[in-house]
């Protein structure tokens, strides 16, 4: 699930060194390595380039994921970004959506319901939850986040959304890069102390650097297909020699 969230969130961030940095922050947060929400929010608030809405979405994701003290202040820059441009229509729709989301229990169910709403209504609904005016499960909140990112990526891509399958090249591209990073991580964990460990680390390292480079300079969405295939091929070859089954990484 977190891989999916990372994919969607990163698909709305313009390529550049900042995108690579945000990818790292998300990975750390999801892995439980970064637990200082105050510092994270302060860092996010001062980032250049990002639109207020993108900052709002990231702030919402960090707040959902990082455990924090109950009384921690909500941040104004996130609240302002998630107020649906102050449009009362967005607020009305957000309340309707919130009532539907309360009935959902799965990430995909929530995402599906949310996709039929406008970005403004989705942002307002996140605002409701962020301001503790309503509560949903984390999984449902992530569904809402991903639906919002898909709407934004779609409008960036100007493509027509199809509900059932992700056809947006930006999201597919980001997904391949996230998968490549995840696979690299898995290779390093498997490497252990065997004599092939150095080789596994090398392959994983190359993959990391490529993903980092692709995020930093930005590439055509089609170029990432090869990256993942190469990585999986290397992984398969390495696992064959190690006598390990490929099952886990399909």
Swiss-Prot record:
InterPro entries assigned to the protein according to its UniProt record, in alphabetical order: Flu_matrix_M1, Flu_matrix_M1_C, Flu_matrix_M1_N, Flu_matrix_M1_N_sub1, Flu_matrix_M1_N_sub2
Upper lineage: Viruses, Riboviria, Orthornavirae, Negarnaviricota, Polyploviricotina
Pfam families in alphabetical order: Flu_M1, Flu_M1_C
Miscellaneous section: Most abundant protein in virion. When expressed alone can form virus-like particles in transfected cells.
Bilayer-crossing regions: none
Gene from which the chain derives: M
Membrane topology of this protein: Multi-pass membrane protein
Subunit structure: Homodimer and homomultimer. Interacts with NEP. Binds ribonucleocapsid by both interacting with genomic RNA and NP protein. May interact with HA and NA. Cannot bind NP without genomic RNA.
Protein name from the UniProt record: Matrix protein 1
Keyword Kinase applies: no
Domain of life: Viruses
Any one Gene Ontology cellular component term annotated for this protein: virion membrane
Region (RNP-binding): 163-250
Motif (Nuclear localization signal): 99-103
Broad class of the protein's primary localization: virion
Gene Ontology molecular function terms on file: RNA binding; structural constituent of virion
